[in-house]
From Swiss-Prot:
GO MF term (any one): acetoacetate decarboxylase activity
Top-level taxonomic group: Bacteria
This protein's UniProt keywords: Decarboxylase, Lyase, Schiff base
SUPFAM superfamilies: Acetoacetate decarboxylase-like
Reactions this protein catalyses: acetoacetate + H(+) = acetone + CO2
Full protein name: Acetoacetate decarboxylase
Enzyme superclass (EC): lyase
Length: 246
C-alpha cells in the first residue's frame, strides 16, 4: 500500500478497519433515563475543572437501546451523566459508558471522546415494567425499573433532555507515557426526531464494583424518569479546552 493511501485510511487494521466512516445515523434509538440525587462531595471528586457543578447534586443514569445504527449495527449502552456548566453553558458531563459493541466502543473513543468500556447492558419490557440492567463480566452492576408508558411526556421537553450539550475528556498519552492530548470536548445532538416520550414511577439499584463504580455516586432520591424513542444523527465533537496549553 502506498504512503499516500495509508494516510487516507480511517483506522486500523488497514484492510479491515474497526469502524467505517460516518455520519452515524440511529433509527429507533430508545432512551431510558433516571435522574437522581446523590452525594455532593462524591460529585466534586469526579467532575473535572473547568466544568462547574450546580447547586443540586444530580446524576442521570441512562440506558440506550440502538437496534439500527448505520455502520455500527445493533447495540445497547448504559452510563452516568452529570449536569454541569462550562462558561455559563449548561450541559452534561459524560462520566462512564458501558456497551456491548466493539465498533461502537472503538469509534466513540478514537473519533470522539466518549468514555466507553465493554459491558453487557440490556433494555427490555417485563410485563408492565420497563427494565434496564447492566452486567460487568458476570456480575450485576445496575437495575433500573419504570412503569411502562404510564404518562405521556411533552415531546419538546423530551427533545430538550436529549439535546443538552455533552462534555467529555479526551486523553491520549505519548508512547513514553507523557501527555500528548488532554482536552475537554463538547458535542450536541441537533438532528433528531422524537417519536414518543413517556414518564412513570421509577427505581434504581446500583451495586459496588471496582471496575464499574456506578455506586460511587449512590442513589439518595429519585427525581424524575423518562422513556424516549427517537431517530437521530451523532454530532461531530469540538475542542473547548486544552489542559496542556499553559
Amino acid at each position: 500500500m502506498l504512503k499516500s493511501e495509508v494516510s487516507k485510511q480511517i483506522t486500523t487494521p488497514l484492510t479491515a478497519p474497526a469502524f467505517p466512516r460516518g455520519p452515524y445515523r440511529f433509527h429507533n434509538r430508545e432512551y431510558f433515563n433516571i435522574i437522581y440525587r446523590t452525594d455532593a462531595d462524591a460529585l466534586r471528586k469526579i467532575v473535572p475543572e473547568p466544568l462547574e457543578l450546580g447547586e443540586d447534586p444530580l446524576v442521570r443514569f441512562e440506558m440506550m437501546a440502538m437496534p439500527d445504527t448505520s455502520g455500527l449495527g445493533s447495540y445497547t449502552e448504559c452510563g452516568q451523566a452529570i449536569p454541569v456548566s462550562y462558561n455559563g453553558k449548561k450541559g452534561d458531563y459524560l462520566h462512564m459508558m458501558y456497551l456491548d459493541n466493539q465498533p461502537a466502543i472503538a469509534v466513540g473513543r478514537e473519533l470522539s471522546a466518549y468514555p466507553k468500556k465493554l459491558g453487557y447492558p440490556k433494555l427490555f419490557v417485563d410485563s408492565d415494567t420497563l427494565v434496564g440492567t447492566l452486567d460487568y463480566g458476570k456480575l450485576r452492576v445496575a437495575i433500573a425499573t419504570m412503569g411502562y408508558k404510564h404518562k405521556q411526556l411533552d415531546l419538546n421537553e423530551a427533545k430538550e433532555q436529549i439535546c443538552r450539550p455533552n462534555f467529555m475528556l479526551k486523553i491520549i498519552p505519548n508512547y513514553d507515557g507523557t501527555p500528548r492530548i488532554c482536552e475537554l470536548i463538547s458535542a450536541q445532538i441537533k438532528d433528531i426526531t422524537v417519536h414518543e416520550a413517556w414518564t412513570g414511577p421509577a427505581r434504581l439499584q446500583l451495586f459496588d464494583h471496582a471496575m464499574a463504580p456506578f455506586n460511587d455516586l449512590p442513589v439518595k432520591e429519585i427525581v424524575s424518569s423518562s422513556h424516549i424513542l427517537t431517530d437521530l444523527t451523532l454530532p461531530s465533537p469540538e475542542v473547548i479546552y486544552d489542559y496542556l496549553k499553559k
